[in-house]
Amino acid sequence: MSRSTGNPSPRKPYTPNPSTPAPSLPNPSTWEPRPAARWEDAFLSGNGHHGAMVHGDPADDRVIVNHHTLVRPNGSEDLRPPELAGELGPLQDALLSGNTRAAERFGAGSPLVWVQPFHPAFQTRVRRAPAESGTPLGAGAGAHGTAHAGAGPEAEYTAPAGTATGPSYRRELDFTSGETVASHGPWRSRVFVSRADDVIVQHITGPAADTEVWLDPVLPGAPANLAVGRSTVLTPQGARIALRLRYPESDLSCTGVSVLRAEGGTVSVSGDGVRVAGARSLLLLTRVRRSPGEPDLDAEWAALPDDDYDALMARHLPLHRSAFGRCALTLHDEDPARQGLPGSELLRHPGSPALLERLFAAGRYHVLSASGALPPRLTGVWTGDWDTAWSGAFTTNANLNLQVASATAGNLPEVLDAHARLIEGQLDHWRENARALFGARGIVAPSHSDGESGRTRHFQRAYPLHLWTAGADWLLHPLCEQAQCRGAAPEALVSACAEVADFYTDFLTREGPDGAVAIVPSYSPENRPENASWGTLNATMDIAAARHALTTAAELAPAHPDADRWRDLAGRLPRYRINADGALAEWAWPGLRETYDHRHLSHLYPVWPLDEINPYDTPGLAAAAHRALELRGSENDSAHGHLHHALVAARLRDGARVSAALASVLDGDFFHDSLMSAHYPDRNVYNADAAHALPAVVLEMLVQSAPGRLVLLPALPAAYPRGALRGVRTRFGAVLDLVWTPEEITASLRPTRDARIELRTGPPPGSPAGPAEPGEASWVTLTAGADRVLTLRRRATGGR
């Protein structure tokens, strides 16, 4: 997959207008002084089902419509994993006997088939009619009335002549409501995606002018043979508009339906849509769905709500605001004026507390808005291009978990409920993977999913993702953390954990020369030893996943008849290995040499998020893990690699390394004006990893919790000496508010159950760079329902 989606233009500097007062910015929100010229810069709204990308152009108000279920059929839908279990024994023999390339034959010849690619639906367009008002839609520039939609020069958007920008133009996104507002003089456009009614709501007011409204399928990368069907019906209130896009060589289609209501004026059919003359305001309600056969348009139109904008917002707002507002960050910035800057200008101040505060709020907003029917994809729930990198899929071996990593501490159960929905909908496919590939009971997760299929089908010599057996434990772990916060695990989670343990019981039947269980074949995403092929033995991530899966299943289901067997098997797993460089080795097998320059940090799974290796209980292994982090390169500068590095560094109490990893992203031009992110520097490849993972880094550097431990400011970068964090959920059942200065920490705890916790703090200001010593611990007893306020001096011992 190419890295490039087109080079973004250099950002235009923001010059405040001296004749107008400085804009106020209600926090948390962001704004821009000009419309979005690129879809990547469009402001985003979403409810976890629908997504909207809002450009805010007064001359041609465009909203790209997305939906989590929109994936293009490509022949992969019904493919099953190949039957390779019969080849497993000979492969294990070969690897154990020293054949370092034997795994390349396991699945060789199986085709590499990408999952169904995620794609946009269409864009709603509300365009001021040309001066020659008799020109019908489809005949003017930018209108397309052809029978097929396709990529071509017309798919690239150019702002119409006369597009208004300047001191009176402003577009804003309010994170607390999910509403985008664009205004220019008396013209105003408001858009949000309703959580209550599952509909995209667009309301435009302004001078009565001729306006053209239609659903436009022409977007970059659209298939040339995408069949387009349209329907327009006038109503007393306005019009009903529909657009059906039938996928090539498929009975499936995505169908968009809109209801237009005009206040005053007249509405007439024109070309591919309608022309509105003299209306004071327009309300456009839009939905899209993917389905086989012919949709019942009358039923789809009738199902849209019959309410005005304010009533729709009144139903939506409590649902969104209560979720977003549970957790909030405030950072002290020496220059208060930075708080009011446009996002594009604030990004020019990468070291400022104001930027980190806004990106924390934006990331929290975006991950919430992308989570509902499913968790966030590689692009959240948004894209403006049919050619999405890596199919816009769920990449599970790193990216998905990084994106949802803030949900537990950040008190966003909606995100983890969506994550659980993805898993529960695929368990049958995971069982197929375990049986077909390994001849085992239980479940094995794939490395890629389109949201429909969970079958393993990625077979590639340099990316043998079918050998990755740690995926089920890795993906279930966020749900295990959520269960710790709640104090109980749901039955579905207990059952899934038991199935992971069943897989390991059947799979882990071989031993190494030391008598310990050998994990063979084994794969450390997406790296290889310097002196062996990708498929090998005893990847550290696999060891950690197997141990965690077996012990967790036994803890959650102590009465299970195999619980003792699971504990025994966990006890026979190999120990972690420390290599000649003093680093935690990526493979715990004699003779395998490290490859340090890589974007993934799979072998540090026992540090983050498992907390099996930490500075308090396992200081020797923590030091080795820190050495491994020091030696790790960033390879191709992927955003997820930098932020994964920061998460591990925070667990190891290294604030300077957290700061450096954040700087790699904030200095690297990874963020679009929308505050959605890119996969690579210079805003290359639209991707949500950085935007969604950054709040997790902030939370980890400020607060860490385990069932019996609380660590305050474990890895605070020096750039943020003062601040406040509200609404953090801890894994011992309390909600935490935190305020800190260079001299003092105040922690307010609201426990929901009794607990006795070990309390530690991070290093005081001015401490040398590197991993801080764990310091002394104190103990705090919490009683359910009894709030507790702790005030601690920031001193070197880390005590109370």
Give each language-model segment a name.
Residues 469-501, 514-528, 536, 540-579, ...:
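Active-site neighborhood of glycoside hydrolase catalytic domains
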Residues 448-479, 534:
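C-terminal accessory segments of proteins
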Residues 40-70, 90, 394-414, 509-511, ...:
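C-terminal capping/lid segments that line or modulate ligand- or cofactor-binding pockets
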